[in-house]
Design a protein with these regions (language model features):
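Switch I (G2) and immediately adjacent beta-strands of P-loop GTPase domains
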Residues: 1-9, 13-17, 198-226, 247
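A glycine-rich (often HGG/GG-containing) alpha/beta subdomain
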Residues: 1-91, 95, 99
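Generic preference for hydrophobic
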Residues: 13, 54, 168-170, 193, ...
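Flexible glycine-/small-residue-rich
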Residues: 15, 32-34, 170-174, 219
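C-terminal-of-GTPase-core extension/linker across diverse P-loop GTPases
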Residues: 86-209, 226, 244, 254-380
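Generic enzyme active-site microenvironment
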Residues: 217, 251, 269
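Inter-motif core of Ras-like GTPase G domains
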Residues: 231-254
């Protein structure tokens, strides 16, 4: 009710007692009939209480992290889940939100701390006879962590691509039917089609969900010599994006030199199957001939790459893992030089441990938190 005793809404009130709530604090939720007038009236009433204010974007999640309910990777997983557009993105975000990456990091960190402690014991008793040679156990610990971290780093590219989208570039000479094929794949007129060569002068992007995988199709400018200045700019961009794409679909005639070097898994097709006597390895965006088969091939290729995807889904994760791996490699290198170098090895391990702690948000993250939480809605 408002200050005059008039009913504002008939609502559901839920209470969550800390530390078992999402934030770890005592929380009350009002489930209202969500009209603008009702929400405005309730907010006006609540603002009259001392000590109340609107939450900052992501503040509830930030409190959950500060209260130990989530680590930083889980916070990012929650953000990715909110933004997920495809089934692969949803599943990946849930894996990160569930804390699997943080659990891995905790195991690695504990092993590195154990290794550093063993080295420190040897350093502390350098002038005395240490009854046990710690180097075999330290080496075993470091080798195990190193293998795990390198394996995780190897899967970061695909993990990042699932989050942001795989790029598939359609490449060929001008008027080869690239824009028509893009429109056929997208199911709409996303690119201008014309019989005039060079109609597409910039890279056109279309986001799609292919079998649950996020894919951005790139319609590139036709690659040819002797183009005018404006078209040449588009051609340069097309070459760059084509080389950087995760997969390339070439529309090329038999014996024609490919304008961008093909790599494993790239697809080469003959354009305009509707105008050919033989449709072998040909495709037509006009009639749709070969389009379903192309979609199946793209799904199969990208799907196979996604089978062993890692949990490090952000560039920040990859950078932290690489820093940790660098410290670990340096420690392993000096460890071979004997006990005289154990102090250096121990220091390198501390660098490696700090990188892992930054990954899960234990240290050096204040500036980063402001950026991450600013992308959350008020209700999170």
């Amino acid at each position: 009710s408002d200050a005059d005793g008039q009913v504002i809404d008939r609502a559901l009130v839920l209470t969550f007692e800390g530390p078992n709530s999402f934030t770890g604090e005592d929380t009350v939720e009002l489930h209202l009939h969500g009209s603008i007038a009702v929400v405005r009236a309730v907010l006006a009433l609540l603002s009259g209480f001392d000590g109340t204010r609107l939450a900052e974007p992501g503040e509830f999640t930030r409190r959950a992290m500060e209260n130990g309910k989530l680590d930083l990777t889980q916070v990012e997983g929650l953000g990715d889940l909110i933004e997920a557009e495809t089934e692969a993105q949803r599943k990946q975000a849930l894996r990160v939100l569930s804390g699997h990456l943080g659990q891995k990091v905790d195991i690695w960190r504990e092993k590195l701390i154990r290794a550093a402690a063993l080295l420190e014991v040897t350093i502390d008793f350098a002038d005395e006879d240490v009854p046990v040679d710690v180097s075999p156990e330290v080496t075993e610990l470091l080798n195990a962590v190193n293998a795990d971290i390198l394996a995780e780093i190897a899967g970061t590219h695909t993990a990042e691509r699932i989050r942001t989208g795989f790029e598939v570039a359609i490449i060929g000479r001008p008027n080869a039917g690239k824009s028509t094929l893009l429109n056929a794949l997208a199911g709409r007129d996303a690119a201008i089609t014309s019989a005039v060569a060079g109609t597409t002068r910039d890279v056109i992007e279309v986001r799609m969900d292919l079998g649950g995988l996020p894919v951005t199709l790139l319609d590139t400018a036709g690659l040819r010599e002797g183009a005018d200045e404006v078209e040449s700019i588009g051609i340069d961009r097309a070459k760059t994006r084509g080389e950087q794409a995760d997969l390339r679909v070439f529309l090329s005639e038999e014996g024609e030199e490919l304008p961008v070097a093909a790599v494993a898994d790239d697809i080469v097709l003959r354009p305009k199957a509707d105008l050919r006597a033989s449709a072998d390895k040909a495709i037509s965006g006009v009639t749709g001939q070969g389009v379903p088969q192309l979609i199946e091939r793209i799904q199969a290729i990208l799907g196979a790459r996604s089978l062993n995807v890692g949990l490090a889904t952000h560039e920040r994760h990859r950078v932290a893992l690489q820093k940790s791996a660098e410290g670990l490699a340096a420690a392993m290198l000096v460890l071979d030089h004997g006990p005289d170098q154990y102090d250096i090895a121990s220091e390198e391990l501390r660098h490696s441990i700090r990188a892992l702690e930054a990954l899960v948000g234990r240290i050096d993250v204040e500036n980063l938190l402001d950026v991450i939480f600013s992308s959350f809605c008020l209700g999170k």
